[in-house]
From Swiss-Prot:
GO terms for cellular component: chromosome, centromeric region; DSIF complex. It is found in: Nucleus; Chromosome, Centromere. GO terms for biological process: mRNA processing; regulation of DNA-templated transcription; transcription elongation by RNA polymerase II; transcription elongation-coupled chromatin remodeling. A zinc finger (C4-type) spans 18-38. The spt4-spt5 complex mediates both activation and inhibition of transcription elongation, and plays a role in pre-mRNA processing. This complex seems to be important for the stability of the RNA polymerase II elongation machinery on the chromatin template but not for the inherent ability of this machinery to translocate down the gene. The gene is spt4. Its main location: nucleus. It comes from Aspergillus fumigatus (strain ATCC MYA-4609 / CBS 101355 / FGSC A1100 / Af293) (Neosartorya fumigata). Component of the spt4-spt5 complex. Interacts with RNA polymerase II. GO terms for molecular function: RNA polymerase II complex binding; zinc ion binding. This is Transcription elongation factor spt4.
Length: 156
């Protein structure tokens, strides 16, 4: 295929998702071009260490957006304003504290998705996950994490 976005089956192991915007690309494409949505803050282009810290091989679901400005799926996933491409529905991983600080210093409003059993805050949504009632915290105002909490990141 002639598209630069085509990924052969043998290359699928090297797919990674940006932990800030959820864009999915090959490791080599992150290395060559960086992340088109947030490279100005993350500096992934040509930086293998940053790619390892700020992208993840653990993600679920794929969404391909041709025109994020008019797509209801882009609005639903909060991907409006991003470039056309393939995005993960859920990215699992944890950004280093210094990267989160850099995002905040750059004026990027970074809020991770967090699944927490038990207590809930205003605006939470009940979900049934694996037969267990879980609160889905979409927009936490104050986020306190412990080592027991699994965090899935998304840009809001």
């Amino acid at each position: 295929m002639s598209s630069s976005y085509y990924v052969t089956p043998s290359q699928q192991r090297t797919l990674r998702a940006c932990m800030v915007c959820s864009l999915v690309q090959l490791h080599s494409k992150f290395m060559r071009d960086g992340c088109p949505n947030c490279d100005n803050v993350l500096g992934l282009r040509g930086n293998n260490d940053a790619i390892q810290e700020c992208t993840s091989q653990v993600f679920e679901g794929l969404i391909t957006l041709r025109d994020p400005s008019t797509s209801w799926v882009a609005r639903w996933q909060r991907l409006e304003g991003y470039v056309a491409g393939t995005y993960a529905v859920k990215v699992t991983g944890s950004l280093p504290d210094d990267v989160i600080t850099n995002l905040e210093d750059s004026g990027v409003r970074y809020i991770p998705y967090v699944y927490l059993p038990g207590s809930c805050v205003s605006g939470d949504t009940d979900r049934l996950v694996g037969g267990m009632a879980v609160r889905w915290r979409r927009r936490p105002e104050v986020l306190e994490l412990s080592s027991e909490v699994e965090v899935q990141f998304a840009w809001i």
